[in-house]
From Swiss-Prot:
This is Nudix hydrolase 27, chloroplastic. The gene is NUDT27. Disruption phenotype: No visible phenotype under normal growth conditions. InterPro entries: Nudix_hydrolase, NUDIX_hydrolase-like_dom_sf, NUDIX_hydrolase_CS, NUDIX_hydrolase_dom, RppH. Residues 61-208 form the Nudix hydrolase domain. GO terms for cellular component: chloroplast. Mediates the hydrolysis of some nucleoside diphosphate derivatives. Can use diadenosine 5',5'''-P(1)P(5) pentaphosphate (Ap(5)A) as substrates. It comes from Arabidopsis thaliana. Keywords: Chloroplast, Hydrolase, Magnesium, Manganese, Metal-binding, Plastid, Transit peptide.
């Protein structure tokens, strides 16, 4: 497979030709900024496909984190777009405090980021999943947190949304700064497709592990009524 792309960095025109016919790759979404943007144009982002890393406990140098997969009765997953990175969609996640029960931390993060309290715990993935920060992300986050993390080690939890959509509020519960600008229910494969490339292996693993629990209750109810 060959890919051609062109664009500008500052006032300079660039052209890129990439040939990936000899090995498999995954492409992230194309991102484009205006020429006047202080940030350089990102023409193409390519990530080699690799499985998520699973560990029994968080490795040294990785931030302890919880991830929340919130599924609706019709088998769709809650995702939201970050305020400052509008092209990036993700499931809720956040840091766990020292000594905090991880399931409680997941409930807390869900409430803080989405306002959701009507959620039923379904399952958790027993092992931790890790991902490394890309260099530019690592530098930015470590300046923000005043840390030196390599990446994040995540414990993932599955919850079923049992409330009404009016409950979802991206201002959260008021205890933390809002992180998301817009939200959507997505099919499992869409969640993976719209994830930022360095989180994608983790998302693939999470959805594979939770897939047996993804039941379309509305469809099952209709089928039962026909029997």
């Amino acid at each position: 497979m060959a890919v051609k792309a062109s664009g500008f960095i500052g006032k300079s025109a660039i052209s890129v030709h990439l040939d990936f016919s000899s090995f498999p790759v995954k492409f992230s979404c194309l991102k484009q900024f205006s020429v006047s943007s202080p940030k350089p144009l990102v023409v193409l982002s390519v990530a080699l496909s690799s499985p998520a890393r699973t560990v029994e406990s968080p490795p040294v140098g990785y931030r302890k984190n919880v991830g929340i997969c919130l599924v609706s009765p019709c088998r769709k997953i809650f995702t939201a777009s970050k305020i400052h990175i509008p092209d990036t969609w993700q499931m809720p996640q956040g840091g766990a405090d020292e000594g905090e029960d991880l399931r409680n931390a997941a409930f807390r993060e869900l409430r803080e980021e989405t306002g959701v309290t009507s959620a039923e715990f379904i399952a958790e993935i027993p092992n931790w999943l890790t991902y490394d920060f890309p260099r530019e992300v690592k530098d930015k986050l470590n300046r923000k947190w005043r840390t030196s993390y390599k990446g994040q080690a995540q414990k993932w939890f599955l919850f079923k949304f049992t409330g009404k959509e009016e409950e979802i509020n991206l201002l959260g519960d008021g205890t933390a700064k809002p992180e998301f600008k817009v939200w959507s229910w997505m099919l499992p494969e869409q969640v993976i497709e719209h994830a930022v490339y360095f989180k994608r292996p983790v998302y693939e693993h999470v959805i594979k592990q939770f897939n047996p629990y993804f039941v379309d209750e509305e469809k099952d109810s209709m089928n039962s009524s026909k029997d």
